[in-house]
A protein has these predicted regions:
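Conserved phosphotransfer cores of two-component systems
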Residues: 43-45, 69-76, 98
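Alpha4 helix (beta4-alpha4-beta5 surface) of REC/receiver domains from two-component response regulators
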Residues: 63, 86-103, 111, 115, ...
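Active-site beta3 strand of CheY-like receiver
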Residues: 46-51
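Charged docking surfaces used in two-component/phosphorelay signaling
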Residues: 16-24
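Receiver (REC) domain active-site loop signature in two-component systems and cognate sites
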Residues: 56
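Helix N-cap/capping motif at the beta->alpha junctions
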Residues: 31-40, 61-63
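A Lys-centered signature of the CheY-like receiver
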Residues: 106
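Active-site residues of response regulator receiver
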Residues: 53, 83
């Protein structure tokens, strides 16, 4: 898999922080602030790692992941949830388990995040 990451988060500070971290690691970064923009980029051919926030307006991360699956856009991506919501919604996570690589809570440990993304990018 290419060293590409799409960060889907409505918090501009998170988008900037993650961009700085992963550009130093040699990744190509795409940042979008909504689920619909994520789907748009996937339809345009994005392939790589997706770090998906859950709590976003209009279309939350769960709905975005469901829409990605429904449209058949998950073939060339690995999705990881990156959220401030400390405890996962186990019922929703169970339904998406085969399509979600990891559940990472904010604030995140930078070294662990870089390591996890490295594993996902190697898939």
């Amino acid at each position: 898999m290419d060293k590409k990451i799409m960060v889907v988060d409505d918090d501009p500070d998170i988008l900037i922080t993650i961009r700085k971290i992963f550009e130093k690691e040699g990744y190509e970064l795409f940042t979008v602030d909504s689920g619909m923009d994520c789907i748009y980029e996937l339809e345009r051919g994005f392939k790589g790692v997706i770090l998906m926030d859950i709590m976003m307006p209009f279309m939350d991360g769960w709905d975005t992941i469901n829409e990605i699956m429904k449209r058949g856009l998950s073939k060339d991506v690995v999705i990881s949830i990156l959220t401030a919501k400390g405890t996962p919604d186990h019922e929703k996570l169970r339904g998406l388990q085969s399509n979600v690589y990891d559940y990472i809570t904010k604030p995140f440990d930078i070294k662990s995040l870089v390591k996890n993304v490295g594993h996902m990018a190697a898939m």
